A protein has these predicted regions:
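C-terminal segment of N-terminal export signals and the immediately downstream linker at the start
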Residues: 14, 33-44
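Sec/Tat-exported extracytoplasmic proteins
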Residues: 64, 92, 97, 107, ...
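Secondary-structure end/capping motifs
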Residues: 243-318
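Short, glycine-/small- and polar/acidic-enriched structural segments
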Residues: 39-169, 175-178, 187, 194-200, ...
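N-terminal secretory signal peptides
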Residues: 1-16, 20, 24-30
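Short, solvent-exposed loop/beta-turn-alpha elements that line the ligand-binding surface or hinge
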Residues: 68, 219-228, 294-304
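Conserved C-terminal helix/tail region of periplasmic/extracytoplasmic solute-binding proteins
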Residues: 311-337
Length: 337
């Protein structure tokens, strides 16, 4: 079945309604531990069961790295990013993984979320190996599959880059098709879409079959002022959590870094994780392992100057979908520990 171009609501900008809060509150009640057994060091993290975050979380739990650093990590399964956002706002979980641009936007709107690095991996823009599309300018009039919806950070970075360097508005000059990444991969392989903007882990199987990266997202980020080694994704939690769980930012960061150290060097650990990775071939397995390792950031906080430059570039391009109306980095976005 061929997908039709359509628009969906900006879920990042969508206000959290009373109904959504009630639903999340119900989830919180179901997930809450009994009062007597609920200790202050229990941290609930919302994650997709099959996402790349699950690999790191499983490593933390398998090796007891949470307990080693003084807390207990509890996994709360979620269906998607919007669900995680709502659960965090409602107190149904303590930690989610998202980008610091979203955190800055939420802080400008009165939230108290903070960010510590998780991964510097971002998406890929791919075309078929024999495609006539050679540059972003060739996407005019083409159908582009986009995973994550209109607020996907990689899609917005590409659009901002196209406006800045080529005066092209891909939102108007091309047809965007928003769908789940697995479905988009199928549509791409059936030639129902001309290009695909998808998450890094879904790009590797396509690359293995010859798909060509139209432009490197690291080059896009660099042009927009962001150091490509600056992680966009991170663990996000409220300052209130940091106050009630002493040193949690440091503890969580150390557990994450310890897990990444294992995943960076231990081949046996990846063999253990393979059932979680939903891969059918050794080639895909090796590609995903290499991709995760390539996304491991330095054990430092993002460069605030580079972050400001990126937000300014988004402002100049007119993109408010991701950053909101305020083009400055909100004070306190990056956790201090």
């Amino acid at each position: 079945m061929t997908l039709s171009p359509h628009r969906i609501k900006d879920t990042n900008a969508m206000p959290i309604t009373r109904r959504m809060m009630l639903l999340a509150g119900s989830a919180a009640a179901l997930l809450a531990l009994p009062t007597k057994s609920r200790a202050e060091d229990i941290i609930r993290i919302a994650t997709l069961a099959s996402g790349t975050l699950a690999w790191e979380i499983d490593t933390i739990l398998h090796h007891g790295l949470d307990r080693k650093f003084g807390f207990t990590l509890s996994v709360v399964p979620v269906a998607g990013k919007q669900s995680a956002d709502v659960m965090l706002a409602a107190g149904a979980c303590d930690v989610i993984v998202t980008d610091w641009i979203w955190v800055s936007r939420q802080r400008h709107q009165g939230a108290d979320y903070v960010f510590i690095p998780y991964s510097k991996q971002i998406g890929s823009l791919l075309v078929k190996p024999n495609s006539s599309i050679k540059t972003l300018a060739d996407l005019k009039g083409k159908k582009i599959g986009v995973a994550g919806g209109p607020t996907d950070k990689s899609w917005i970075l590409i659009r901002s880059f196209a406006k800045k360097t080529m005066a092209i508005d891909l939102e108007k000059d091309s047809e965007a098709v928003f769908a789940a990444p697995r479905l988009l991969n199928e549509e791409f392989e059936r030639d129902h879409i001309d290009a695909i903007m998808t998450y890094w882990q879904f790009s590797y199987p396509l690359k293995a079959k010859g798909a060509r990266e139209l432009i490197a997202l690291s080059d896009v980020a660099k042009t927009l002022g962001l150091d490509p080694d600056t992680p966009l994704l991170g663990y996000v939690f409220s300052e209130r959590l940091a106050k009630t769980h002493s040193g949690i930012a440091t503890k969580l960061a150390r557990a994450s870094q310890a897990a990444k150290l294992i995943l960076a060097k231990d081949e046996a650990e990846w063999i253990r994780l393979r059932p979680l990775m939903n891969v059918e071939t050794d080639q895909d397995f090796e590609a995903l392992k290499a991709g995760f390792r390539a996304g491991i950031p330095a054990a430092t906080m993002p460069n605030k100057v580079a972050a400001e430059r990126l937000l300014q570039a988004l402002s100049e391009s007119g993109d408010t979908h991701l950053r909101g109306e305020n083009a400055t980095l909100a004070s306190g976005t990056f956790a201090e520990f």
